[in-house]
Amino acid sequence: MTIDNLAFEKALYDKGYTYICGVDEAGRGPLAGPVVAAAVIFEKGFYHEDINDSKTLSAKKRETLFELIKQHALAIGVSVVNHEVIDKINILEAARHAMEDAISKLKIKPQYALTDHMDIKGIPYTSIKHGDQLSISIAAASIIAKVTRDKLMVDYDEVYPQYGFKDHKGYGTRKHLEALNLYGVSPIHRKTFAPVAKLLKQ
């Protein structure tokens, strides 16, 4: 069964909305680095069959689509919320803040938002479970957020090469956990996340 990932947008166009943004984040799970959110508005009816949930795409494909989305989107907003804020307000609230901030950075004010399973303030919205698979706007936002965050983690890898951030992007892989135990906690690790918090208590 093929999924019509324009169905949510079409329903809103039929209700008279013109500017609909999809919003998603990347980086809720990692032990290090920021959470990044993106908001994307396409022209009414825009479709591209390859734009899908960023997690299902190869890094190379994501980067190709990142450029395509930048070319075709009417507006893109991106927000980066760092590890210190994540530790202060928790990852769920940090992700929510990043999504709301990404919307505020759009050069066109959206009339409605579609989010990937997140409640937000300041705009009428629909929270969609597995939204990055069901809405092209959310899928595009997931790609923008993921590619942006991955690039940031590659940059961090140059500052802290011993942790291998360019490979695992901060996720808790075996290699990352081994590096954590060997080298200790870096300045960009999330101190409230269990494996890091455990190390800090030792």
Swiss-Prot record:
It catalyses: Endonucleolytic cleavage to 5'-phosphomonoester. GO terms for cellular component: cytoplasm; ribonuclease H2 complex. Its main location: cytoplasm. The keyword Manganese applies. GO terms for molecular function: manganese ion binding; RNA binding; RNA-DNA hybrid ribonuclease activity. Its cofactor is Mn(2+); Mg(2+). Keywords: Cytoplasm, Endonuclease, Hydrolase, Manganese, Metal-binding, Nuclease. It is an enzyme of class 3 (hydrolase). InterPro entries: RNase_HII (IPR022898), RNase_HII/HIII (IPR001352), RNase_HII/HIII_dom (IPR024567), RNaseH-like_sf (IPR012337), RNaseH_sf (IPR036397). One of its GO terms (biological process) is mismatch repair. NCBIfam families: PRK00015.1-1, PRK00015.1-3. Belongs to the RNase HII family. This is Ribonuclease HII. It comes from Acholeplasma laidlawii (strain PG-8A).
